[in-house]
């Protein structure tokens, strides 16, 4: 009976820290624009800072997969999640490009580390993994929805105050992890009592298919998140300040979908559900690229985000007992590389053939979602 309250506490710690992580991580896109206005650096520097954050996020996954075998799970999480407080704190000190570069890299490290830690805490301590993961990502979406209003309010006083608020939230994340008992989370024990890394998941075909599916999901989702505002403005479909609120449309759809999956319409057959979601994403994205009116564009963007919302948490939950600190340290960063690669490809294609052609390329990872989901659905279930 004592185990149940402990599991609930660990799961809730994952929910709460992922909510704050949603604020800190998504705020980076707003912060970089504030810093650009304040210090006047070029657009190339803006792209570099965001790329460094993505690289930090990628590296964090590998570090959280290896460091627990040396330091233990909790010390590793505490070390790596200092990045939010340190990163945003350093941004407020100076506009030096080197310091800003290090700051965004540290924020990326914290983002990836929090993702890994929360996945372990929630997935390993939820009776229903699919519901738990969808609820966890709903917490992140709530934070993402809140961050523009929080930064705007603090930014009215000064950019420095906005950065200080984010650094304070980073400290809160760290303190929650500090006070959460995490012994034995995401690891196995050897006869000597030390944590032993289990690499058996590397031999699982299902693990690599799920990683491929998440790679496509990250690629498709980040491309829309990163490029859609620019695409809408450039094409004249949505103009002015309204274009910036398309991000709110996406996160609103994401939150609604994940809450519905978690509480109203839970998936009885998650693998088949991923196939349906993949098909939905592909169809809605195809018609989104054909939209020429503001109403149709917003409606199709909402539908795309709604269809995409359950893919990531459902795929991670489908990993079952393969969900360990080490396996997530391989799966999540490998998958997140799609979020680095596809937006870059769109940019390169757009330079040569126009942004419309570049955005059309994003249909490729959407189709990849369908193919990987079908392959996963045909695999024998691994608990």
Give residue spans per PLM region:
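Residue-level signature of mid-helix packing/kink "hotspots" within the transmembrane helices
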Residues: 26, 53-62, 145, 251-259, ...
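Extracytoplasmic gate region of multi-pass secondary transporters
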Residues: 28-29, 204-256
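Helix-breaking motifs and short loop linkers at transmembrane-helix boundaries and internal kinks
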Residues: 40, 72, 93-98, 127, ...
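Conserved MFS/SLC helix-loop-helix module at the cytosolic interface between two early adjacent transmembrane helices
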Residues: 59-98
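Helix-to-loop junctions at the C-terminal end of transmembrane segments
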Residues: 60-72, 155, 257-269, 350-351
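Cytoplasmic helix-loop-helix junction between adjacent transmembrane helices
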Residues: 103-138
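Helix-loop-helix hairpin linking two adjacent transmembrane segments in secondary transporters
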Residues: 128-129, 134-182
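C-terminal transmembrane helical hairpin of 12-TM major facilitator-type secondary transporters
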Residues: 268-315
């Amino acid at each position: 009976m004592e185990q149940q309250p402990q599991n609930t506490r660990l799961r809730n710690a994952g929910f709460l820290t992922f909510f704050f992580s949603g604020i800190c991580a998504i705020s980076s896109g707003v912060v970089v624009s504030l810093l650009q206005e304040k210090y006047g650096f070029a657009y190339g520097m803006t792209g570099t800072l965001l790329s460094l954050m993505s690289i930090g996020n990628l590296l964090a996954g590998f570090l959280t997969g290896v460091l627990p075998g040396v330091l233990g799970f909790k010390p590793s999480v505490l070390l790596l999640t200092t990045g939010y407080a340190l990163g945003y704190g350093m941004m407020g000190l100076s506009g030096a490009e080197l310091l800003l570069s290090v700051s965004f890299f540290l924020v990326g490290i914290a983002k990836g580390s929090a993702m890994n830690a929360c996945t372990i805490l929630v997935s390993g301590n939820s009776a229903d993994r699919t519901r738990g993961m969808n609820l966890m990502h709903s917490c992140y979406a709530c934070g993402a929805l809140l961050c523009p209003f929080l930064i705007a309010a603090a930014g009215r006083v000064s950019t420095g105050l906005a950065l200080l608020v984010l650094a304070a939230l980073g400290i809160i994340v760290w303190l929650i992890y500090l006070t959460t008992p995490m012994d034995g989370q995401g690891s196995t024990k050897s006869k000597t009592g030390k944590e032993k890394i289990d690499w058996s998941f590397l031999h699982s075909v299902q693990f690599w298919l799920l990683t491929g599916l998440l790679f496509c999901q990250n690629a498709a989702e980040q491309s829309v998140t990163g490029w859609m505002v620019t695409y809408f403005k450039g094409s004249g479909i949505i103009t002015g300040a309204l274009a910036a609120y398309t991000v709110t449309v996406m996160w609103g759809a994401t939150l609604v979908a994940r809450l519905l999956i978690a509480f109203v319409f839970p998936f009885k057959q998650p693998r088949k559900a991923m196939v349906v979601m993949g098909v939905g994403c592909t169809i809605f994205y195809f018609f989104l690229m054909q939209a020429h009116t503001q109403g149709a564009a917003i409606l199709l963007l909402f539908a795309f985000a709604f269809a995409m919302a359950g893919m990531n948490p459902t795929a991670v939950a489908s990993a079952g007992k393969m969900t360990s600190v080490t396996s997530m340290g391989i799966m999540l960063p490998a998958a997140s590389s799609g979020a680095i690669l596809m937006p870059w490809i769109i940019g390169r294609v757009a330079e040569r053939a126009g942004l419309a052609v570049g955005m059309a390329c994003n249909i490729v990872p959407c189709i990849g979602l369908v193919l990987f989901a079908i392959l996963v659905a045909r695999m024998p279930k691994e608990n």
